[in-house]
């Protein structure tokens, strides 16, 4: 085997745990909720902090790679990822796990641009480079798609920390391999590093998400929630103005003035919001309501994972034959139909209907995702292709983080509003049981058998009703977005084969 392909194998090996970690916690959410005694809000932060931090860090880490060399960045990111995985596996509380997941995101944000730079510098020939990038994309989508299944397999036999602990030996091996195999790239010391701007971007996103969660949960005084939201909005405004005035901005905000690029970003974010949010909701529904094990839940969701992970070539062919506008709008419409159908489906008595709709959902979401990438890259000027790609990467990570936050917020709010608690619970117990189904499950362990059974029945009924509302809401919003996408992409020319 040539050194080029050995380098690619080493790069892909370090990328695998990063891709898996984006979704591995989805089936672990119920287990984490019970094991750590985390609230519904804490559980959402445990899962979505990874994508939200990564969204703000991936761009400055690319600049850091230019400054110190991408091999050093790859090794440093791998080391941080390994240490953070160990910290996460040993976390005694929800807050320490949230901090560990944030550190994991920092390591992952170093690894992603380093792997891409390694591929670009290793493969000079365009055909080989495209093949290598295709394999990199397949590892990313496949790892994310099968993350819940991997998590389910580990939780079936080991404690919850195993979903993080498995990264440690992998990281040790890949550090040794990459240190020897990956060639050193020259560093460009003059490359500016906008770390402060990245931190302000992350802070603004986290403050806005936190204020939205607090407003819906009623956890803070209204004035304090408004103050946090105002601070986040002010930081985001400062960041945007800074990017517009910079000669070498971290994010080229002027690209958002192009309607097609803006539509592509909206599609990318929406696709990730719906896919990631749906997987998290399904994992809790299957385990808490239908009493499936983590592995059984992962297997039940396999159709959406397989369809989303392997629909790329078909979607690409459809774009070439039918046109970007048609595939983008069609993907949104089919996704909306899938969500509306799943909202009316009983997963216990109608499994085949659920699997069929999930397969359609996975394919349609992935088609919309490919269409978004095509729209962004086709509309961006050639000299700004890298900047457009960076914006697309941010859209993916923000979509993943916001999907967990939005689906989780609507689910929690609806659950709390609809649960009918059995009599005999104290005020503190009633508040705990109304917070989330995970906390209701934890509470049943301290109750008499009859009361525990009544509470579980009430929690399951409320969660099922909330789950249907969330999916129906997502379906309606996708219908509205499809109409907007159809209008905004009206200027995109059809391919010759479609004329």
Q: Can you annotate each of these PLM segments?
A:
Residues 37, 69, 90-96, 158-159, ...:
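Helix-breaking motifs and short loop linkers at transmembrane-helix boundaries and internal kinks
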